[in-house]
Regions:
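Class I S-adenosyl-L-methionine-dependent methyltransferase catalytic core
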Residues: 1-187
């Protein structure tokens, strides 16, 4: 279960079916993340990409805060269906576009489609191999997915030490960390 922390659906509790193997971002980490994002960005005006969307907690939190252009990519059919049904229940269908796809395959194809995003959030499985973390970062930062001066947030286990030239900072919240990247206009 997770709770929408702020916005139009503040306090709304959403329970995923018990047979879903998911790890929604904790309320504590979620609140900290959105405090940072809302301080830096006008969420209502952004184009957002939510990768490894799981059951959609980040997408729904963004929609609740007024974000109108959210693309959620999730490979698991049941999870994607849950995001879709929850978006309908909360009247977020016009704000959240759910795509069922392997994130890595989708990113490789998306670079040729011309759409880029102001904010990219990725919450890959915690057991993702280190080389795939680096591939994910590279695909997002170097393939036109993130707009110039856009913000990419990678959620990962705190024990993973992420390094990259475009890494701005990492914030730790217990076992979870958020690494913030900015694609700068000038290298």
């Amino acid at each position: 279960m997770y709770r929408i922390i702020s916005g139009g659906w503040k306090g709304k509790k959403i329970s995923a079916p018990k047979n879903f193997e998911v790890r929604p971002t904790t309320d504590f980490a979620n609140e900290a993340l959105f405090s940072i994002l809302e301080h830096r960005l006008d969420l209502s005006s952004l184009s957002v990409l939510d990768l490894f969307a799981g059951i959609g907690s980040i997408s729904q939190a963004l929609a609740s805060r007024g974000c109108k252009d959210i693309t959620s990519v999730e490979m698991n059919a049941k999870h994607a269906g849950f995001i879709n049904s929850t978006a309908k229940d909360l009247d977020f269908s016009s704000q959240i576009n759910i795509l069922r796809a392997n994130v890595f395959d989708w990113l490789k194809k998306a670079k040729n489609q011309g759409k880029s995003f102001d904010l990219v959030f990725a919450d890959p499985p915690f057991d993702l191999p280190e080389n795939e973390y680096q591939e994910l970062i590279s695909l997002i930062l170097s393939e036109g997915i993130l707009k110039e001066n856009g913000c990419f947030v990678l959620e990962h286990q705190s024990r993973h030490k992420i390094e990259h030239p475009d890494l701005q900072e990492t914030r730790k919240y217990g076992n979870v960390s958020f690494s913030f990247f900015t694609k700068n206009e000038n290298p």
